[in-house]
């Protein structure tokens, strides 16, 4: 998937690709020393089956099954994964602003200027963002918290239809005030 996206961007397609928490976890796994995201539950790492790192590495032919030594899996990853793909993930922007829209992976911390948002919040926040009902400076378009279908909440639009849980991606069309699923 990373190669497909990189090829599209290189070909000049008008795609905006934002960094998500799983992209950062992949990048951090590929660093020496290996970095662990502090937002993960104790006992979990990016390689935990719930987080998808094991499947990501399997797509490169790497066995990350339980019982293997982390340093061995990481060494195999260094050999198998093109450095350009990790550089691409590392360089992805955290946000994108267009007109009255503010696109971000997880959300924002309410009442903090958009220019002062922390990376951890942009990639991981749930509360107090999800329960905040007042207006944000811009309409926030996000994912990270799966719903049955995309939903408009007045001050934010959650586009996460649960693809991380095996459900299909849900493309949407956005105009100044509305959101319409395309399928």
Tell where the protein language model's regions lie, with residue ranges.
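Core catalytic region of metal-dependent phosphoesterases/phosphodiesterases
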Residues: 1-48
């Amino acid at each position: 998937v990373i190669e497909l996206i990189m090829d599209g961007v290189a070909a000049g397609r008008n795609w905006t690709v934002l960094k998500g928490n799983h992209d950062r976890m992949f990048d951090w796994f590929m660093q020496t020393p290996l970095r662990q995201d502090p937002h993960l539950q104790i006992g979990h790492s990016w390689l935990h089956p719930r987080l998808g790192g094991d499947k990501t590495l399997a797509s490169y032919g790497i066995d990350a099954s339980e019982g293997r030594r982390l340093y061995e899996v990481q060494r195999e990853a260094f050999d198998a994964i093109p450095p350009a793909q990790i550089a691409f993930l590392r360089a992805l922007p955290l946000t994108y602003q267009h007109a009255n829209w503010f696109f971000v992976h997880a959300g924002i911390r309410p009442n903090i200027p958009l220019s002062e948002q922390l990376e951890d919040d942009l990639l991981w926040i749930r509360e107090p963002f999800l329960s905040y009902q007042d207006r944000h400076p811009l309409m926030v378009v996000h994912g990270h918290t799966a719903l049955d279908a995309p939903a408009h909440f007045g001050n934010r639009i959650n586009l996460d239809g649960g693809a991380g849980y095996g459900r299909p991606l849900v493309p949407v069309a956005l105009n100044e005030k509305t959101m319409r699923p395309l399928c």
